[in-house]
Swiss-Prot record:
Gene designation: rbcL
EC assignment: 4.1.1.39
Record-given protein name: Ribulose bisphosphate carboxylase large chain
Source organism (scientific name): Drosophyllum lusitanicum (Portuguese sundew)
Enzyme class: lyase
Assigned protein family: Belongs to the RuBisCO large chain family. Type I subfamily.
UniProt cross-references to Pfam families, sorted A to Z: RuBisCO_large (PF00016), RuBisCO_large_N (PF02788)
Amino acid sequence: GVGFKAGVKDYKLTYYTPDYQTQDTDILAAFRVTPQPGVPPEEAGAAVAAESSTGTWTTVWTDGLTSLDRYKGRCYHIEPVAGEENQFIAYVAYPLDLFEEGSVTNMFTSIVGNVFGFKALRALRLEDLRIPPAYTKTFQGPPHGIQVERDKLNKYGRPLLGCTIKPKLGLSAKNYGRAVYECLRGGLDFTKDDENVNSQPFMRWRDRFLFCAEAIYKAQAETGEIKGHYLNATAGTCEEMIKRAVFARELGVPIVMHDYLTGGFTANTSLAHYCRDNGLLLHIHRAMHAVIDRQKNHGIHFRVLAKALRLSGGDHIHSGTVVGKLEGEREITLGFVDLLRDDNTEKDRSRGIYFTQSWVSLPGVLPVASGGIHVWHMPALTEIFGDDSVLQFGGGTLGHPWGNPPGAVANRVALEACVQARNEGRDLAREGNEIIREASKWSPELAAACEVWKEIKFEFPAMDTL
């Protein structure tokens, strides 16, 4: 007879190993598992470990040709989720051998590739990953990182200011370039292509790049400050994307942009390598993230997508605004903001961080706060995000009643006032409105902005809770 017993397997015999001591080289994952009724949590956790590593649904004779113990994923711990009836956190350890070096694509294909459609589970969410230094070291990471970016821009001791050019679709290249110039001239550091501005019939990419470069150089000459515009290089093919990045380099501009989730991790990593080799900064937009991360019970939490981006490479990434939202969300957001910027992040479940993560000096990424923010938010943003961040006011600049340059002036004055107040030891959380009011006495542009946006709020209950 053959040396194995055919039939459908009980996963937990092989893949649930509560005594396992995790190794420093393992990739560790925390999954939020919602089993189907009647499926015990150990079996569900083991099934996740199996299906995302070596397992298949039945015994196969080729199993005998490998060392299962060396290659299998292991569910090594399960804990119930407080306040949920039938939900568990399953911790899975994957041996490093299972992953291709320097490939975020392969890491995700392995860990989340197949298992999310698994019938024994009602829902599954990847909450966090621990990437071991041995794997991190196979990635280049961000093209430049926070310190190099500050040195390139010669801007220190404050957050950077940006603005997304609106209306996002329909402007001609010349009018688009004019809006870029006006915002930069007024005092912003950066302007931004919207994520869906690629190369459409009303504005082809090459024309846009040219007029934006002209706007940058004119604003630089007049202000004596270094300026940038995130030229979106996202395209339908990797070749076309690199072609756009090459043209940006030829124009001598400082920064390009990519939509890393719609563009894909393979394209993103290629672009990040090009950017480091050619001295371009890389701004990353997270279009499509909410499709993946918004459901509490199913999908992938954004902190995992943020870690993946730091491996794949990007110098800025959009990461929520916190402002006007609830407390719990603030802690969770700051959790992954720290993951992006710091060298080491300690395990802290109150902030949604399941594992201590060391980045072994991989450069950090600047978090970008963007979407529905205006001058009244400036004290809170300065306090929450600190100096190492990019604050982006699209409508909050272009919506100014006197036009774009005064809109930019208002934001810059508000920021400088908040930074100065903080440096003088004032409490931004408590005195924020007062600080903005005082500054607006000296700046009619800011006073007008304060008047327009005094009633605007975007308050809804938090989605992202522990």
